[in-house]
Amino acid sequence: MVPEPAPAAATEPRRSTRRRLMTAAAMEAEAEAVADLDEIDREMSRAESRKRQRRTAKEKPGARKGATEWKPEDVEKAAAAEGVAELDEIDREMPRPELRKRQRRTAKEKPSAHEGATEWKPEDVEKAAAQEPEGTELDSGLSPAESRGKRQRGVEKVKRRTRKKTAKEKTKETTEKSAAQAPEKMKVNDAGGALAEDVCADEPDAEQMAMEEEEEAADVLEAEERMGKCVGEGSAEKAATRKRVARPSTARRVEDSDDHFVGDPVPDDEARQRWPVRYSRKGSDSLLKQEPDEDEEMKARCHYLAANVDDEIYHLDDDVYVKAGPDEENYIGRITEFFEGVDRGSYFSCQWFFRTADTVISSKLLKVHDHRHNHKRVFLSKEKNDNLIECIVSKVKIAHVDPNMTPQARAHAISDCDLYYDMSYSVAYSTFANLPADNDGALGSEATSNISCDDADNSSKGKLSADIVAPYSEQTETASLLDLYSGCGAMSTGLCLGFAFSGINLETRWAVDINKYACACLKHNHPYSQVRNEKTEDFLALIQQWDALCRKYVVHKNDTLEPSIDMPLNDADDVNEPLPEDIFDVEELLEICYGDPSNTGKNGLWFKVRWKGYDPSYDTWEPIDGLSDCPERIKEFVEKGHKENILPLPGAVDVICGGPPCQGISGFNRFRKHNDPLEDEKNKQLVVFMDIVKYLRPKYVLMENVVDILKFADGFLGRYAMSCLVAMNYQARLGMMAAGYYGLPQFRMRAFLWGALPSMVLPKFPLPTHDAVVRGIVPTTFSQSVVAYNEVDTRCLRKALLLADAISDLPKVGNDQPKDVIEYSVAPKTEFQRYIRNNRKDIQDYSFRGDDPSEEGKLFDHQPLKLNKDDYERVQRIPVKKGANFRDLKGVIVGPDNTVRLDPNISRERLSSGKPLVPDYAISFVKGKSTKPFGRLWWDETVPTVVTRAEPHNQIILHPSQDRVLTIRENARLQGFPDYYRLIGPLKEKYIQVGNAVAIPVARALGYALGLAYRGESDGDRAVLKLPESFIYADQETVVKSSAGTPGSEIADSEQLFE
């Protein structure tokens, strides 16, 4: 534990934390950083002013009327008139490259390059910047100097971002229109091969390049700011915990106060047995030490059972208010000890309760209106500290309430108590959990079983909640899973694999995603799943309507018909009567959806209708209002759908998993809503996800998201998700897991949030199985949520996997590979390769319910994105060596500051098309300091993450020994997809499916932990568990025998990793 500072006052109680205050060196560094930012701001302001003056002076009135941009000769004349020296001065003054890049781009582009685009003038840019709401940067926690710098730099981004916005809006409209239509049934062969559009673009997307450059710069800025930032500022939780550590001062002795212990001391033998740590001696002088070392238990001379404070008698296990600092609410704790210290001070030990404001979901950081927490609710913790008895303020009546009570019974139970608690809270992994049943609400080995109010009477007064489920031993059916924002199904697939390893079957019963190709992929690999290609908010409306229909036509519990149905049934005698020519008879209802599949402009409940006497090509979507004259068809459809479980009903879902997209937090976007991220439409899916959880009340919830959810706006969205679960009376636990730690040659860290009904065991996070090459930045505030071993315990980890371990056995393919099914050419070379080639049965994948259609020896999706002619020529000239990239091309010079430039002594080499061999965007990317453009991976390396775009213009994605980008299958291997898992759609869509997926080994490890919890196996109250050795890979004999049909004798030596 990090040492903590001494308290400011002797009488102020302290409670525990793991934070360190800012050092003098850090404060000095921060001051220097602010000064540098101020200087940059002033330089940019002067440069921008001179730029506008030059434009005004050089542009004659009327001469440029109607022109939309400068011609190259105009730019050259202006530069010559002002002199090269002046331009050099401007370059030196511009720390960010946007202005210079835009000048170069404008000088080299022909007027037709932006035909039809609106050119922004300087005054337009200023006007747009002025319209932005003030205080955005300041409210996000930036200093005034940082805010001014961001605002000035942001002016130059307005033009570029405005063009991007238009493109995004068009994409959004197209996507929403596609999603609103009826779900399509796709055949595997419809999108299995390469299409004409599956070719790398001739030039990189300027907006994408700029965004990724800014993101890289943002990472650097975040790392630099963290070096000088005081850990814990601005966080209510950290402020609260910071007050819980410092040892009490011994300036005031017991004789200085009227407060005193009551009665005789506890007999020495009994005291040493109950509190042995207080009397242990590490050295001969331990009893003489006036100040204990940090993390060392304060030593005692003797113990007592009661104390008199302000003429009030306090006993062990009393709940009390404890004096806090100035302008703070009194702390809440439970007395666990009274003792006289070796300094003869009178102390008590207190086990702390946390208010909601003291936790990760503090209302001081999270101001929302869609849910709230009871102000009487507190959470018991394991945190303890020693304080002088004079810090006790008064008693408080706290009731322990059964978390499974109904709201009515809970209200009755807490009506005569000051506060109540039904869960514990721990800062580690931000855990809200049930209290251990064996100690009835007390935590820790020294805590007793007494509580402030008799909760036995409270429990008997009310009715237990309907959330209570039968023990696992009484359940025989396969557990059901709903996968929201499913993508191609990676997370649900991994969860099912891990669940099976724990001895239970979990089936992806339902899945929802807006991407039709991802839905087709999931359906192909999970044929028994009900896969819906629609917006998630429409799915929520649909299941609400479906529940109403089932209540109308079917009784949930016994599947019998309701005694009365509002809509009259048609007379059976009229079935065969001929119909008028202009009337169509409904033969059967095929599907149901909510939305507007017929583009009528009105959302509602629709049925897909098969018309009598017509083939399927005449099927149409009809609103439920238009089917009022055929209620018997609706009844038949609902009865059949209810029996087949086509849609989930409240209380009938075991697990919900999903990764709601929060695109409003991505990138270095100055237009992000720091003050209220939920106001951004791009973050609304998080609310929809929680609304579905609230409606369906599954036993378990697992939400996945990018780590930025815990970085942006002080982790607002992550805190919101946890707050929603706790407000819904779910247990919750937050962790961050990196894919590399679970046996993959990549790092990619993701945030995971467990939720569990109070009647279930809260799942733990599985500890790593492998070492990994650490990349990226962990949010400091949530550093205790990183799932990892302590540094001394890493000896149990396997070696980190490298690129060769994953892909060295795959066949050699060229830049243009049209076949999506080929055969293996060599035997597997590593343990990972042998496992990843296994069939469904050996990997325990039961998505086909026992059948295994895997084609032995067949390899799917081993296709690269085809490079265009220019890029292919460039890639062919990148050397086959470690660390190779565009800097190895002819004509590039690397300066002493690691900045690249063209060699002025030789002519610029050209491609066969006439374009330069070394493109301008590669030289200017990240101010010329990046080594990513046309970078080649190497066998003994790992990748930082698996990308969704396979273009080499600004990322290291070239194969180590072949002149192409990594194939879809190679990327899938890096994500842990078994080779039998087939992707569906155009090549670019397949890259997106793999890149957006949760790494399957991570999901599998989580699934194993979920399976144990589902079985009721808690194994203590630790937040993490160690995976069994047999979990990492299947039994070795089974693996070798079944590796894609290759006999075990032909398995290559594991050390022969590449050709």
Swiss-Prot record:
Residues 479-1017 form the SAM-dependent MTase C5-type domain. The active site is at residue 662. One of its GO terms (molecular function) is chromatin binding. Its main location: nucleus. PROSITE patterns: BAH, C5_MTASE_1, CHROMO_1, CHROMO_2, SAM_MT_C5. Transmembrane segments: none annotated. It catalyses: a 2'-deoxycytidine in DNA + S-adenosyl-L-methionine = a 5-methyl-2'-deoxycytidine in DNA + S-adenosyl-L-homocysteine + H(+). SMART domains: BAH, CHROMO. This is DNA (cytosine-5)-methyltransferase CMT1. It comes from Oryza sativa subsp. japonica (Rice). The lineage of its organism: Eukaryota, Viridiplantae, Streptophyta, Embryophyta, Tracheophyta.
